[in-house]
Amino acid sequence: IQGIFARDFLDQNPNVLRLFCAFGGGGFSAGIAVFLKQLRPDIQLIGVEAEESACFVAAKAAGKPVELPSVGIFADGVAVKVMGDETFRLCNALLDDVITVSNDEICAAIKDIFDDTRVIAEPAGALSIAAVRKYVSQHNVEGEVLGAILCGSNTNFHTLRYVSERRELGDEKLDVLHIRRCA
C-alpha cells in the first residue's frame, strides 16, 4: 500500500529529484522505496528520523538492527526502539541517504506547514518538511524540485504549546519552501 503514496506523488510531481520520507520502524519508507526504485531509480529517496529516535542511523552504523536504550516522545509516531530485519535490509539497500532532525527543526516545520496550508501536522508527519529545510540549508540547493511526504494528524493542544515555544529555535525561514497538497 505504501507504493500507492509513491505513485500518487510521482503522478502529481513528475519532476522531483529527491523525495524525503519520515522514518519510524522503516515499513513506510521500505514500501515507498521498493516501488519508487522500480519506477524511477533516478530519484534519490532520503529517509528522515527524529534525532531522539534514530534507529536506522544506529542500525546502519552497526550493520544490523540494534535496540536503542530509549526514544524521544515528541515525535511519537516515529519513536521506534528497534527496526525489523527485513525493513533494515530493504532500507539499507534502497534508501540513498538518511537525515536526522531535532525537535526544534520539527517545530519550525510544523509552523511552516501551518503558515502555508493552515493544516496542523503532527510532529512525526512534519519530519520530511524539517529535513527538506535542513537539506536546502546545508547543501545550498537552488532550482531543484524536492518532494516531501507528509502524513499523520495525531496532535493535541499540549503539543501545540510546545511547538509554539520551540519553533523559533529551529526557525530559519526558507523563502523557497512551497507546500502543495496532493489529493
Region roles according to the model:
Residues 2-4, 84-143:
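Active-site-adjacent helical/loop segments in soluble small-molecule enzymes
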Residues 1-93, 134-142, 146-181:
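Glycine-rich phosphate/pyrophosphate-binding loop at beta-loop-alpha junctions
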